[in-house]
Amino acid sequence: MISLSHFLVLGGVLFAIAVLGIFLNRKNVIVLLMAIELMLLAVNMNFIAFSHYLGDVHGQVFVFFILTVAAAESAIGLAILVLLFRNLRTINVDDLDQLKG
């Protein structure tokens, strides 16, 4: 049987991979967005695991709120990314330091 510690270790490993993805690759916006989504996935796994093992539904309801925020974040982030690529022809974070008003 899979215990709570297995789920928590898996969530911790996913979160650590996401943090490494952010720190090791600060150039590409798409990789940064994917790492943030992986962080949210790790947090959701921990909420689901605690909710299941405690017999409480509040953690599962909270996961639905996190999923809606993550979907909105992804949609807005990718829309901004498409506009930046159309205007600047790059998605490199270092090239996105120009302010135009």
UniProtKB/Swiss-Prot annotation:
Primary localisation category:
membrane
Query: Which family would the database say this protein is a member of?
Result: Belongs to the complex I subunit 4L family.
EC number, UniProt record? 7.1.1.-
User: Which of UniProt's keywords are assigned here?
Assistant: Cell inner membrane, Cell membrane, Membrane, NAD, Quinone, Translocase, Transmembrane, Transmembrane helix, Transport, Ubiquinone
Q: What is the lineage of its organism?
A: Bacteria, Pseudomonadati, Pseudomonadota, Betaproteobacteria, Nitrosomonadales
Name this polypeptide is given: NADH-quinone oxidoreductase subunit K
The scientific name of the source species is: Thiobacillus denitrificans (strain ATCC 25259 / T1)
Report if keyword Membrane is assigned: yes
Q: Name one Pfam family in it.
A: Oxidored_q2
What is this protein for, i.e. what is its function?
NDH-1 shuttles electrons from NADH, via FMN and iron-sulfur (Fe-S) centers, to quinones in the respiratory chain. The immediate electron acceptor for the enzyme in this species is believed to be ubiquinone. Couples the redox reaction to proton translocation (for every two electrons transferred, four hydrogen ions are translocated across the cytoplasmic membrane), and thus conserves the redox energy in a proton gradient.
Q: Which gene encodes it?
A: nuoK
Q: Does the keyword Transmembrane helix apply?
A: yes
